[in-house]
């Protein structure tokens, strides 16, 4: 969900300042996402930074999105309430993590940034894992926009959330590929996504 940063009744007098395209993720630091049990090495690979409070607790994640190898947007997500906002735009970016991988035997698609990093760790940190940008409702659009990227892989594994929306989106996304290429991964009962599995270890 998006949060509304504006308030009050004088909306007609508000001045809208366009968000500048960031040159870099200019807040936070590379560290383990301790709230999600994701290692510093994985966070660093994906370019994810954290903001900490005075007690050293992770309070915000910063997820970078690239157009090719140029940073176009950063998603800021609060740990406590899970609200987020985006600096820049990811309308014409690749999927989360897409810039890190180029072809291979397997690529796994998941439904969120933390699930992407978690699946990467669960798979031994050696297989490509990317995340859609707009959740289950935007999965088909996101994957369609990156079909050229997926053509470079032999197998596409779809591992969306283990809920109704995720399962429905998995079927729709699988239909974008020839039947022998796309496979839907069903997570064990009790796990919504890869991060649940990582945290249970």
Regions inferred by a protein language model and the residue ranges of each:
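Structural alpha-beta junctions
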Residues: 125-128, 175-185
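Phosphate-handling DNA/RNA-contact segment within nucleic-acid enzymes
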Residues: 54-154, 170
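Disulfide-bonded cysteine-rich modules in secreted/extracellular proteins
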Residues: 25-30
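Short, acidic/turn-prone active-site loops that include or flank metal/cofactor-
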Residues: 132-138, 162, 187-190
């Amino acid at each position: 969900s998006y949060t509304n940063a504006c308030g009050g009744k004088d909306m007609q007098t508000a001045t809208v300042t366009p968000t500048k395209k960031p040159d870099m993720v200019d807040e936070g630091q590379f560290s383990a996402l301790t709230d999600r049990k994701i290692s510093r090495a994985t966070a660093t690979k994906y370019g994810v930074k954290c903001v900490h409070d005075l007690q050293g607790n992770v309070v915000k994640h910063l997820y970078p999105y690239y157009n090719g190898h140029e940073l176009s947007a950063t998603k800021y997500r609060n740990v406590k309430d899970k609200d987020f906002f985006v600096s820049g735009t990811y309308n014409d970016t690749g999927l989360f993590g897409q810039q890190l991988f180029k072809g291979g035997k397997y690529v796994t698609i998941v439904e969120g940034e933390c699930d992407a990093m978690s699946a990467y760790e669960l798979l031994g940190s050696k297989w490509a894992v990317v995340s859609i940008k707009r959740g289950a409702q935007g999965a088909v659009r996101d994957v369609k926009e990156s079909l050229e990227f997926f053509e470079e892989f032999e197998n596409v594994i779809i591992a969306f959330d283990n809920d109704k929306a995720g399962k429905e989106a998995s079927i729709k996304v699988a239909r974008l590929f020839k039947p022998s290429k796309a496979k839907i991964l069903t997570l064990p009962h009790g796990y919504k996504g890869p991060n649940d599995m990582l945290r249970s270890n």
